[in-house]
Amino acid sequence: MVSVKKIVASALVGVLMFSAVGCNMVEKTQAAIDKTTVATVNGEKITLGEVDSHLKGVFTQMKSQYGDKYMDDPQVAQQILQQRQGILNSLVEEKILVVEANKENIVPSEEELNKKIEQQIKLYKEQYGEEGYKKAVESMGYNEDTFKEYLKNQFIADAAASNASKDIKVTDEEAQKYYDENKKQFEVQAKGVLARHLLFENEEEAQKAYDEIQSGKTTFNDLFTKYENNKLEKKTPIAESFVVPDENAQVAKEFVEGLKSLKEGEISKPIKTQFGYHIIQAGATYEKGAQLPFNEVKSQIIQILKQQKDSQKLKSDMDQWKKDLNVKVYDDKLQEGLKISK
């Protein structure tokens, strides 16, 4: 028979433990905090540890600025809470899009994904250098393999997002209406030259296009028209036009130098920048305050309106997918380990 003293002792321990937890006197270990479920998507859990792994760089900065007890500072805790919320929202939406991509059978092939991943990593290394790239990857909580997996999921999610808006179009009438109602937006901010350019991923494609223009097989304008919607569809090559200011141009140095060597109407040989290979055509010179004509900004306007429509469509679809996949988000759990002022 169990003694009465043992029963009473057990009961008291239970009451005291309940009270302590209720008053936050018993603090969770970091391991327990990391295992806290902050969302579920289609039955798959997202833990707080997964969220925080994306904030390693932020935590390092906070620790350097505020010391080891930075999470005890209510203002810092509030900032971290906001960061966690943003990361969680991104993770939830990424998982939803990956599910939808698989459901719609639009996941790119392994070969295509690997090619995209290698190209993206190569671009990062060219922009930030080998050491800068490694530090950036580590600050986001990844190693080389997990970063590649992250990029893979991003490309799969992009496929689902693009598929959701594939039938959305912007008419010339809508573009003209936007131009007429927002003319101030298309005033030149500083004197400069209008640059129209074709951007290719590699030198071979750029050289082939240049040779075809020079031989008369095609024209720069024909290629510009052919490629000007590619940016919207996340395809290459792309075609863009914009005014490059005479001074303090926030454009790649090689691009500016290539443009300055051209007279109006002339076309450059392929020029390499960190973004790829450009064939540039020099346009007219515009004074500050001049109005850019509709035909020179039409593709920009279509891009603006398409992005607006895409965003609205994706938001609507996302709301429905969250219901279909029984998505649960526990925002209150994001406060774990933080001292949030009431």
Swiss-Prot record:
E.C. numbers: 5.2.1.8
Keywords on record: Cell membrane, Isomerase, Lipoprotein, Membrane, Palmitate, Rotamase, Signal
UniProt-recorded Gene Ontology molecular function terms: peptidyl-prolyl cis-trans isomerase activity
Matches recorded under SUPFAM superfamilies: FKBP-like, Triger factor/SurA peptide-binding domain-like
Subcellular location: Cell membrane
N-palmitoyl cysteine: lipidated positions: 23
Reaction equation(s) it catalyzes: [protein]-peptidylproline (omega=180) = [protein]-peptidylproline (omega=0)
Positions of S-diacylglycerol cysteine lipidation: 23
Membrane topology: Lipid-anchor
GO biological process entries: protein folding
Gene3D superfamilies named among the record's database cross-references: 3.10.50.40, Porin chaperone SurA, peptide-binding domain
Chief place of localization: membrane
Biological function: Plays a major role in protein secretion by helping the post-translocational extracellular folding of several secreted proteins.
Protein name as it appears in the record: Foldase protein PrsA
Annotated organism of origin: Clostridium perfringens (strain SM101 / Type A)
Organism ancestry: Bacteria, Bacillati, Bacillota, Clostridia, Eubacteriales
Gene name, Swiss-Prot/TrEMBL: prsA
